[in-house]
Amino acid sequence: MFKSRKWAGPATVVMLLSTISAATSAEAASGNPTKIISLSPSATEILYAIGAGSQVIAVDDNSDFPKTAPFTNLSSFTPNVEAIAAYRPDLVILQSSATNAATIKQDLLKLKINVFLEVTPNNISEAYAEFLALGKATGHPSRAKALVTTMKAQISEIVTKYRKKNPTPIFHELDNTLYSADSSTFIGQIYSDFNFANIADAANGGGYPQLSAESVIKANPKIIFLDDGPYGESVATVAARPGWSAISAVKNRHVIVLPLDIPDRWGPRIVDFYRFIGQTTAKIN
């Protein structure tokens, strides 16, 4: 389950438009497409935030925000070239993590359809890079730059207000088999910004280690964040786990269910997630 929700991907955001090479994409990836298909929930949110919403003709089956986006049954995970081509787009935003993404990209290029290949960012700077690249690719560079500037200021204000004076141990739960996200990941960086001490950092797992119940109990986190709340996990289910009642976060009811989807996307609502984390942990020392 968690694999469809977690932040994952190579260390560098690489944006490719049409046949442009990675070395020159930043300079050449510009244009003013009028028929955009977004096969990425994060990209969909970014497009609307930078003023490109009117150019979007279709979005994938997971792009549920904003509600005004033209929702379809196009799959972001298993894209179908024929289904995409039927919309006659002039730009398709494709996730590099999609099944057979490289082949899909080449097949679309053969049909003279430009492709923006999106690689999941590992930190907020890489997310901002996607904002700017999408702005350039869609003809809205100024709006994208302004949005990034505003977001940076808002996040800085939130972190300044809520950052912990002393490191506070936390556990981010991706699913009930105890996969987590360490500080090398996108969401892990957000926790680091608040001076949280991520207990997953002690494990090995390429950014997303699987912890044992014993290691979580021993680490005794003061806060537990549940990314699997929509899948049935709650304060009650966590408290019912053998031995977990001894954990500080459980004893003090500092188990926080994260909002659906926002933690797993790197669009403009990143600011909302920072604010949520700051406000819900403000009184926890």
Residue map of PLM features:
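C-terminal segment of classical bacterial N-terminal signal peptides
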Residues: L17-S25
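Bacterial N-terminal signal peptides that target proteins for export
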Residues: F2-A11
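Extracytoplasmic ligand-binding site segments that recognize negatively charged/polar headgroups
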Residues: T103, V119-L134, P169-G188, G232-S234
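Proline-aspartate-enriched helix->loop->beta-strand connector
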Residues: N80-S97, I113, S212-L226
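Structured C-terminal subdomain patch of bacterial secreted/periplasmic proteins
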Residues: T34-K35, N122, E126-K136, K145, ...
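His/Asp/Glu-enriched short active-site or ligand-binding loop at hydrolase and phosphoryl-transfer sites
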Residues: D60, S184-Y208, V257
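A short, structured surface patch at a secondary-structure boundary
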Residues: K35-Y87, L91-S97, A102, F196-I199
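Basic- and aromatic-lined ligand-binding clefts that recognize polyanionic substrates
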Residues: A29, T34-I50, S142-F194
